[in-house]
Structure formats: C-alpha cells, structure tokens
C-alpha cells in the first residue's frame, strides 16, 4: 500500500448537496428553501433563542445565583487511584501529574476516601478527607499536609 493508493472507507464520504442547479437535480427551483418568507431570503433566518416574538424561554426564567470570585477549585483524587504507585513511594502533586492521575492543579489537591489502598505510601498534598487519611495510615503510610 502506498500513500497515493489510500482511499476513505466506503460510505464515510458524502458528496456535497449541489442546490439550485436545475429541476432535474431534484434541488433546483427553490433550492430546498420552500417558497417565500424570511428563511427563503439571502441571509434570512432568526437568531438562536428567538421564538417569533413570544417572550423567549431564557427571558421567562428568573436569574439565579452568582459566580463567587473567591471560590477555590480543588482537584479531587480517591485513594484507590494511588495503587498505581510502588510501595514506599513519596506521592506529590508532581508525581500525580506525571502518572496522569490529574491533569492540572488549580488551588490544590484533596485525597478522598473512596476505594481501598493496598500500598504503603507517603502522600504529600494540600488536603485529606478524614477517611482518606485513616486509610493511608492503616496501609502503613503517611498523610502529610503541604
């Protein structure tokens, strides 16, 4: 097989709809736009959310809440995800990113207690739930706050 012999899978490519090219094509005359009216015109149509003059849904529903600019975004990790580390490893935020457990850290990392921990680890992150700290220590490890 060579590069010039590559072809797309059968049925994966569809020819574009050629409208307004004569009645024999099946899409001549009005080109699929119906008869007259706003939608038949050049640039015609209504904006998203417009309901024909009726009070639209997004204006009928009340506003609610606000965005707290001081809110902290904590990245959560359950203890069962830590089993991919070797016994005796020091688990830091950088180690979690390196292993692909978390993508990025905004305002810190919190370890939660869902699942079981089978490895003895020294974990160094910002926060722990009570059950997570207990499980880390029960496995023979340490839960250190940084």
From Swiss-Prot:
Residues 1-54 are annotated as: Disordered. One of its GO terms (molecular function) is rRNA binding. Residues 21-31, 42-52 have a biased composition (Gly residues). InterPro entries: Ribosomal_uL15, Ribosomal_uL15/eL18, Ribosomal_uL15/eL18_sf, Ribosomal_uL15_bac-type. One of its GO terms (cellular component) is cytosolic large ribosomal subunit. The keyword RNA-binding applies. Keywords: Ribonucleoprotein, Ribosomal protein, RNA-binding, rRNA-binding. Gene3D superfamilies: 3.100.10.10. One of its GO terms (biological process) is translation. SUPFAM superfamilies: Ribosomal proteins L15p and L18e. Disulfide bonds: none annotated. Part of the 50S ribosomal subunit. PANTHER family: 50S RIBOSOMAL PROTEIN L15 (PTHR12934), LARGE RIBOSOMAL SUBUNIT PROTEIN UL15M (PTHR12934:SF11). Belongs to the universal ribosomal protein uL15 family. Binds to the 23S rRNA. This is Large ribosomal subunit protein uL15. The gene is rplO.
């Amino acid at each position: 097989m060579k590069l010039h012999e590559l072809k797309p899978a059968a049925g994966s490519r569809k020819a574009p709809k050629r409208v307004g090219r004569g009645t024999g094509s099946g899409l001549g005359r009005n080109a699929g736009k119906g008869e007259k009216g706003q939608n038949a015109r050049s640039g015609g149509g209504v904006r998203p959310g417009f309901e024909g003059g009726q009070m639209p849904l997004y204006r009928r529903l009340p506003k609610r809440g606000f965005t707290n600019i001081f809110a902290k975004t904590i990245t959560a990790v359950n203890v069962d995800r830590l089993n991919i580390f070797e016994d005796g490893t020091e688990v830091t935020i950088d180690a979690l990113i390196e292993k692909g457990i978390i993508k990025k850290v905004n305002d810190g990392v919190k370890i939660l207690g869902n699942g079981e921990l089978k490895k003895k680890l020294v974990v160094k992150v910002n926060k722990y739930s009570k059950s997570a700290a207990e499980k880390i220590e029960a496995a023979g490890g340490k839960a250190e706050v940084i």
